[in-house]
Structure formats: C-alpha cells, structure tokens
Amino acid sequence: MNATTSAAAYGPLAGADLEAELAQARVADSDARDAAILEHDGSASVVPLARRRTSGTAPDDAVTLSGVSKRFGARTVLDNVELGIARGSFVAIVGRSGCGKSTLLRLVAGLEQPSSGALVTRGEGGGALDTRIMYQDARLLPWKTVLQNVMLGLGRGARDQARAVLDEVGLLERANDWPAQLSGGQRQRVALARALVHRPQLLLLDEPLGALDALTRIEMHALIERLWREHRFTALLVTHDVQEAVALGDRILLIEQGRVALDQAVPLDRPRARASAAFAALEDRVLKRVLAGGPGAADHDAEHEADKVRPVGQIRWAV
C-alpha cells in the first residue's frame, strides 16, 4: 500500500490563512448499567497501554505514530508516542495546558516535523490523506463575503458546492454578508464550511469552540457531530473541555508528560445524552484522571501558547 509520511506535501489547510424516544424506564436502566460499567475498576472501555500497537501500521488506520518524539531545543514536548487513529473515527485529545496536545495536532497536520520516530498517513485507496484544520480563531478574510471565504482556493465553478456546504451549516442566507456582521458562533460555522467544502478525509480541530458561550458550544457540538456522521471523515479534536471530549469523541486520549497516559473508549450511544448517569460517570472518570497529573506535570508547548483563550468558570475544563 502506498503510504505518505509527515514529510509528504499536504493540500492547503483550510483555516490556516484561514450536529423514537425510549421509554423512561428503559433509559434509566440503560444509564444505570452503563454507569456501573464505567465505574468498575478495569473497565473494558479503557484500552490498556500495553495493548496499544507498538510497531507497524494497521490497514484501517488513517494516521499512525511510531516512537514519535518532538523536541524544541532542550525541551521534550512529545516523548516516544505510539498511536494509531482509525479511519472514520472521532478522537478527542485532552490534557493540561502545555502537555503537547497542539504539538501533536501540528505534527499530524504536517506543520511540524517529528524530532524522531515515524508519522505515517494513509488516504483512502493508499493515496495522500487530504487534511483540513480548524482553529479557535475563524480566520476569515474581512474584505470577502461569507461565500467568498468558503470558496477560498477554489474556482468559480465551485460556487454551487460552497452554497451547498453553507446550507449544511445553516448559513446559506448569510452567503453575501461580511464576516463582521456575524456572531462568533456563525463565524466558526463559516470556518467549518470552508474546511468541509474540500470534503477532507481528515479534519483537525484545535480548540475551535474555546471562545464561544456555553449554549453556542452545545449547538456547534450537535452540528459537528451531525456532519461527521454524514460524511464519515476522520476527526481529531484537541480540547481543554472534558465534557466536550465525551460529547464528541468515540475515543479520548489523555496526553501527560509528553505521552499517551490514558486511551479511553466512549461506549455511549449517539447523540449523547449529557444528563445521563453514564455520561456523567465517564466525564468524571476522565476529569479525575486529568487532574491526577498535577499542576506541574507537563512542559509547555513551544508554539502559540499566548493565543489560548480560556473561558472563566468552566468547572469541567482541565487547565
């Protein structure tokens, strides 16, 4: 199979210059059962570190890291990371500030190169893995309309395709508006549309909702989940918000001291019931594990730490 490595050229990264009710008794029984499973020590939902692949590449993996380390001068940010990301999966990465989450994302995006180890990406059919990235800042060009921002890098023949994607994110009626006329949540919807118009195989999300209010975040969660389920791209989300990780991911990775310290499956039905006992139990389990690392457990990322915007009063944020 033809594989591309992190040294191979990626396509342009959009955003870089740039979402039958069960009977109540059945719901309660299911929630209680799932919560009990999650609370049980040695739950099968937790993937033991020893079971993670240490060499080779599974044929269904879109991304594989084998012994990957990243150093900035004398500082080691990622240390011998072994990781496989299955094609079509939604993986959320959590951890304290500076643990290496964003560095890992930038390596996968090809914006940084590993100091050692191998990072392999595989597109469908063995070709290049078309990758797009979405940041906390929507990075829209203020002198271009919403539609023109979505069409960046595309020819005029893509107008209908861009309008269709704007319709998918609920902003078709704002196609001719300027970015300054939009709310923060609407601007992020445009950024999402700009990434999805290319129909990427891999979508990287670097804390894209961190600056939004709580209600808008929940609406964006529903939108992102719906589009992921429809298009089945591989998604890799970096977030400080453990609740967000449980809401969106089918797998949660905790980065601690430059390594994958926890690899947790999310055995919850979609769409996620945030008020369920199982959801709360899993959120609590992951949050406690994040906090157990201690405030001095991680070195700082060497890039864009000053760009982080962290809402105040989010009790489920691990910062």
Swiss-Prot record:
Coiled coil: none
GO MF entries: ATP binding; ATP hydrolysis activity
Domain of life: Bacteria
Membrane topology according to the record: Peripheral membrane protein
Class of enzymatic activity (EC top level): translocase
GO cellular component: a single term: plasma membrane
SUPFAM superfamilies registered for this protein in UniProt: P-loop containing nucleoside triphosphate hydrolases (SSF52540)
Catalytic activity: ATP + H2O + aliphatic sulfonate-[sulfonate-binding protein]Side 1 = ADP + phosphate + aliphatic sulfonateSide 2 + [sulfonate-binding protein]Side 1
InterPro entries, A to Z: AAA+_ATPase (IPR003593), ABC_transporter-like_ATP-bd (IPR003439), ABC_transporter-like_CS (IPR017871), ABC_transporter_ATP-bind (IPR050166), P-loop_NTPase (IPR027417)
Cross-referenced PROSITE patterns: ABC_TRANSPORTER_1, ABC_TRANSPORTER_2, SSUB
UniProt binding sites for ATP: 95-102
SMART domains, A to Z: AAA
Chief subcellular location: membrane
Keyword 4Fe-4S applies: no
Sequence ranges assigned to domain ABC transporter in this UniProt record: 63-282
Keyword tags: ATP-binding, Cell inner membrane, Cell membrane, Membrane, Nucleotide-binding, Translocase, Transport
Compartment(s): Cell inner membrane
PANTHER family: ALIPHATIC SULFONATES IMPORT ATP-BINDING PROTEIN SSUB, TAURINE IMPORT ATP-BINDING PROTEIN-RELATED
Family: Belongs to the ABC transporter superfamily. Aliphatic sulfonates importer (TC 3.A.1.17.2) family.
Subunit-level organization: The complex is composed of two ATP-binding proteins (SsuB), two transmembrane proteins (SsuC) and a solute-binding protein (SsuA).
Described function: Part of the ABC transporter complex SsuABC involved in aliphatic sulfonates import. Responsible for energy coupling to the transport system.
Protein name per the record: Aliphatic sulfonates import ATP-binding protein SsuB 1
